[in-house]
Curated annotation (Swiss-Prot):
It comes from Streptomyces noursei (Streptomyces albulus). The gene is sttH. This is Streptothricin hydrolase. Keywords: Antibiotic resistance, Hydrolase. The active site is at 176 (nucleophile). Catalyzes the hydrolysis of the amide bond of streptolidine lactam, thereby conferring streptothricin (ST) resistance. Can hydrolyze streptothricin-F and streptothricin-D. However, this strain is believed to be a ST nonproducer, which raises the possibility that its true role may not be its involvement in self-resistance to STs. May catalyze the hydrolysis of naturally occurring cyclic amide compounds that are structurally related to STs. Optimum temperature is 45 degrees Celsius. It comes from the Bacteria.
Length: 276
């Protein structure tokens, strides 16, 4: 994962570049140049959501899977943590508890950063910050790109369980969260994105371009860039879960649930680091 304060449009330590999202946004909603931008503040735990994400008039339809994106120690604790780490951790814990109780599929995405990065494999910052509950319905998928589907077994895992509807949470909003959600949409999944369960960093000021962009504004822009297909809800607490139609039984032996070698999947935790 590349932090936005490391390289606005400059080569990053990982050798990748920040790029504009590819989500489809109606032309009529595109912004024109402005001399000033409205203030966006972080969302307090129990205050009203932004007008654009007003509470739905009817209960949300349940989802069959939860994708927890890069909730790794470096990004949610210590000096490198996103500003709203405490909120994201609280909401993610709630989502995990309800998903597990309902028998939904849970997938923890874990980013393998470049050597020397805060999330380089097998460093303290790389570790998943929240506990994984081993079993056939809970997996860890390691990745090397922002998109959790890129060169991983995530798509096959969802298909095997019959998942067609899922929720996404984690960090960073405009990078790995958005990239993973966008691909899920392109693959035909229904995607629910709880507004209070993802976060990112402030974007630092750039001479002759902009002042500092608050993290809350970056997160909101990331949601908007996903287009009309994504379902943005104000509260993670409003997301219900249900077991997917083809999910393995909870009592299935671990050996039967183990994936084939080379898929990058593990029901009990991260697999060995891939050869470099």
């Amino acid at each position: 994962m590349i932090r936005p304060d490391r390289c606005p449009w400059q080569p990053c330590p990982s050798g990748r570049y920040l790029s504009r999202p590819s989500g489809r946004v109606p032309r009529s909603t595109m912004m024109t140049p402005m001399t000033a931008m409205p203030a966006v503040t972080a969302m307090p735990p129990e205050t009203a959501a932004p007008p654009e994400t007003a509470a739905p008039a009817r209960p949300l339809r349940p989802v069959q899977a939860l994708l927890v994106v890069d909730v790794q120690t470096a990004f949610v604790s210590g000096a490198e943590a996103v500003p709203e780490a405490a909120r994201v951790l609280d909401r993610t814990r709630g989502l995990l508890a309800r998903a597990r109780t309902a028998g939904a599929l849970v997938v923890h995405l874990q980013n393998d950063g470049a050597p020397g990065a805060v999330d380089a494999p097998h460093t303290p910052g790389w570790e998943l910050h929240l506990p994984v509950e081993p079993g056939p319905r809970e997996h860890v998928v390691r990745k090397t790109e922002d998109d959790g589907f890129a060169d991983t077994g995530l798509g096959a895992l969802l298909d095997a369980a019959g998942v067609t509807e899922l929720a996404v949470c984690g960090v960073l909003s405009e990078m790995c969260v958005a990239a993973t959600a966008r691909t899920a949409l392109e693959l035909g999944h229904r995607v629910v994105l709880p507004h209070d369960a993802h976060a990112t960093y402030d974007i630092p000021a750039a001479p002759d371009i902009s002042d500092t962009v608050p993290a809350a504004m970056s997160s909101r822009a990331a949601e908007w860039a996903l287009g009309d297909e994504v379902e943005i809800v104000p509260r993670a607490a409003a997301v219900p879960f249900v077991a997917p139609p083809l999910a393995p039984a909870p009592e299935a032996p671990a050996a039967a649930a183990a994936p084939a070698a080379g898929t990058g999947l593990s029901p009990a935790g991260p697999p060995p680091a891939p050869a470099r």
